[in-house]
UniProtKB/Swiss-Prot annotation:
A GO CC annotation given for this chain: small ribosomal subunit
Organism per entry: Thermomicrobium roseum (strain ATCC 27502 / DSM 5159 / P-2)
Region of interest: Disordered: 37-56
Oligomeric and partner information: Part of the 30S ribosomal subunit. Contacts protein S5. The interaction surface between S4 and S5 is involved in control of translational fidelity.
Alphabetical list of InterPro entries matching this protein: Ribosomal_uS4, Ribosomal_uS4_bac-type, Ribosomal_uS4_CS, Ribosomal_uS4_N, S4_RNA-bd, S4_RNA-bd_sf
Name the UniProt record assigns to this protein: Small ribosomal subunit protein uS4
CDD domains on file: S4
Name of encoding gene: rpsD
Molecular function (Gene Ontology), one example: structural constituent of ribosome
Lineage: Bacteria, Pseudomonadati, Thermomicrobiota, Thermomicrobia, Thermomicrobiales
Protein's job: One of the primary rRNA binding proteins, it binds directly to 16S rRNA where it nucleates assembly of the body of the 30S subunit. With S5 and S12 plays an important role in translational accuracy.
GO biological process: ribosomal small subunit biogenesis; translation
Annotated Pfam families: Ribosomal_S4 (PF00163), S4 (PF01479)
Amino acid sequence: MGRYIGPVCRLCRREGVKLYLKGERCFGPKCPIVKRHPNKNYPPGQHGPTQRAARRPSEFALQLREKQKLKRVYGILERQFRRHFDEAERRPGLTGDNLLQILESRLDNVVYRLGFADSRRQARQLVRHGHFLVNGRKTDIPSYQVRPGDIIAVRPESRRREYFKVLEETAKNKAVPAWLSRDLETMSGRVLRLPTRDEIDIPPVNTQLVVEYYSRR
């Protein structure tokens, strides 16, 4: 499955906001977005400095930027993101809210929300390497959709690794959203229910513009 392997801080610069793609580093003074001089706050690339002073973006450009921003927050490429959008359209209710709920219900995101990884990118790698069980079964598909009642746990064999030994202590400082519960003694978490829009903590994204982007294609 394809994935972005380039510099992730470049993605934040392109969108003009912090997307929190590097975990704890994004909250500290070492974040390139924080360190960057205000006069150099423009998109990356040869023509970046001229883009800031360009004419007002078109409606399509605004829709595209919101779509790209949401994709990059969750670390998903276009084909898979479009599948998630199509599924959101089929569900009853607001398509934008459904899309966010589907993205939050991905296994790699739930691993991140439970505090078992510093970033979604790291969570995706841990899942792909088979370190987690879902309801007692090894699951290595990052896009797997969890459901209320599902139990996500670190594999007993993986708990012997140094990373997870340290994690048992460091995860104590990481808050867990209300729609999840966590037990650090068993290194597991439970999905209590699906999240509501207000409970999804991500950089501001106008999901209506994302819906409009795909509606015109």
